[in-house]
Amino acid sequence: MPATSFYADAAYNTQKSRQALDPDIAIDDSDLSVDEIQELEIAAADPATFGASANRRSTDLVRLYLQEIGRVRLLGRDEEVSEAQKVQRYLKLRIVLANAVKQGDEVATPYLHLIEVQERLASELGHRPSLERWAATAGINLCDLKPILSEGKRRWAEIAKMTVEELEKMQSQGLQSKEHMIKANLRLVVSVAKKYQNRGLELLDLVQEGTLGLERAVEKFDPTKGYRFSTYAYWWIRQGITRAIATSSRTIRLPVHITEKLNKIKKAQRKIAQEKGRTPTLEDLAIELDMTPTQVREVLLRVPRSVSLETKVGKDKDTELGELLETDGVTPEEMLMRESLQRDLQHLLADLTSRERDVILMRFGLADGHPYSLAEIGRALDLSRERVRQIESKALQKLRQPKRRNLIRDYLESLS
């Protein structure tokens, strides 16, 4: 059963498209009504709707999962509004904390860093991490963990102009409401995932990716708009699934943002070819996509052409290409990803101050491949260990802004 995190970062990139990545992958279900979506939710709870071709073990897992999510009843309209309001109140508190960090608050900065580390670990593990693992991942001593959390929460309450008790109550209500909304809509995730079976991912993998989309929908849903949550969540669920399919469908995996641009170019090529009866030029594509010809060319150049390892080479065509390639070292896929990542890292780090850039390069081994400890960096730059940690935290906060963070996250997911 897919693990679901209820502690993910609230600051998602609001400019991500709700459209499917590839018209060849997408299903034309854009006209589904609210009633039809709710019917899908109910139908998804019936194990009989799954084909008999799946192996028994997989079918049993699916049946157990459906039975578990079927125990959670669907939310009524008023319940959706009430739960969503609690989630939004909590997320507004998170924005208050994030703004304080942006302004350089020395107490709020390490506190927010710890919270983000905990949420990331919870997402990866499927449960909250131990204090030891939490502290180690955050790069601090275990004895410093509780003081930072205690002081940080007091500072957060002070900034939000409320008591610590009021803050904790609102935080608890927000997280519980978020979890409730996710669990109550998992049947919708299954119903959407079923439409994308036999495309390279198992059903439960599709459900897991769709659940991540559902989580984003919960955080972004505005109950004052007047529409049902299932209508809004459907698009986020679908996007999560289609992005996963697009990522896994390539022999050489490209960053998702490159895949999205490539799919837009393909769609524009088909449209222009149909309208003008000829192969579109770079200029045609640039006009259609509101890009420059250079930008279109750069996207196309990042897409490698596949060559079969069984291709016959040599004068007598008696040798296969695969026999001439070394098996050790960096693979072509890794080389492509690292070169592309290096180019974008240079642009990313250009926004930092020179000292912040030096700390990040040394801390993560981006310059020479050797990561340095805070103490080692402090000795090299003639700074205290605590000052290095503060500089690192401030630099990472800049790099975590959605427009930058999501770009690098795509690369890291592909490299891993």
From Swiss-Prot:
GO terms for molecular function: DNA binding; sigma factor activity. GO terms for biological process: DNA-templated transcription initiation. Pfam families: Sigma70_r1_2 (PF00140), Sigma70_r2 (PF04542), Sigma70_r3 (PF04539), Sigma70_r4 (PF04545). It comes from the Bacteria. Keywords: DNA-binding, Sigma factor, Transcription, Transcription regulation. InterPro entries: RNA_pol_sigma-70_dom, RNA_pol_sigma70, RNA_pol_sigma70_r1_2, RNA_pol_sigma70_r2, RNA_pol_sigma70_r3, RNA_pol_sigma70_r4, RNA_pol_sigma_r2, RNA_pol_sigma_r3/r4-like. A motif (Polymerase core binding) lies at residues 205-218. Residues 374-393 bind DNA. Sigma factors are initiation factors that promote the attachment of RNA polymerase to specific initiation sites and are then released. Belongs to the sigma-70 factor family. This is RNA polymerase sigma-C factor. It comes from Nostoc sp. (strain PCC 7120 / SAG 25.82 / UTEX 2576).
